[in-house]
Amino acid sequence: MNRRQLLLSLSVVPATVALYVASPAAIALDLGGMLGAAAGDIVKAASLTDQDVRAYASQMAGYMDRKASVAPAGSGYAKRLSVLTSGLSEDQGLRLNYKVYVTKEINAFAMADGTIRLYSGLMDIMTDDEIRYVIGHEMGHVKNGHTKQRMQTALAASATQKAVASSGAKHANLADSVLGDMMVKVVRAQHSQGNEREADDYALQFMGRRRYDRKAAVSALEKLAKLSGGGGSNWLSTHPSPTERAARLKTQIV
């Protein structure tokens, strides 16, 4: 798979564990190179530990940060995020770190090492508690092991198709072409209704623990529904529409 094929494949799905569908512009951050740098030596899927996942996630997050336009510490976006995440460097044993990518795209993603990245386009349209819902949702993806599951699935498929790992070796050097194929599998594997619901449920519980306005979870999804044409019917069939998710969360708020 060449670079053009990879970007075309990714143009219909979000990068990493994104909460919303990203456009090609948001994804075209040299993903092939990112994975090549981050995962030169990847353990077999069967032996992938939590420590392995966190290590690779950290490298990949670092690459993304270098390639993206990160809001500087003194900027309005960074200051707002600092206020919003005050006291949120850790949640239920999960150590977290935050940054804002300056882009018009409406998106957010999390990685297994506790990396959470918000896009400035998302912050522009959401209230403080709506952003906290997004943060809680991304925490949910990490806490529920969705990121680890995606990587294991992708590694298993790549190892099978490309024979990247021998039976006697723990690590295998993966070519960028294999990594590109693996990245497509990673982002496609994440879009299960079960995963999204678990992340939404975690977000609601997180907001309750922190005494944030839980109704903001519903209003955030309703905003996204309007942006996607009233239900996101063009999303992948395995990705619940924001309208459906908002309606489901309403039933849980008393």
Where do the language-model regions lie?
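A Zn2+-metalloprotease active-site environment signal
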Residues: N2-V254
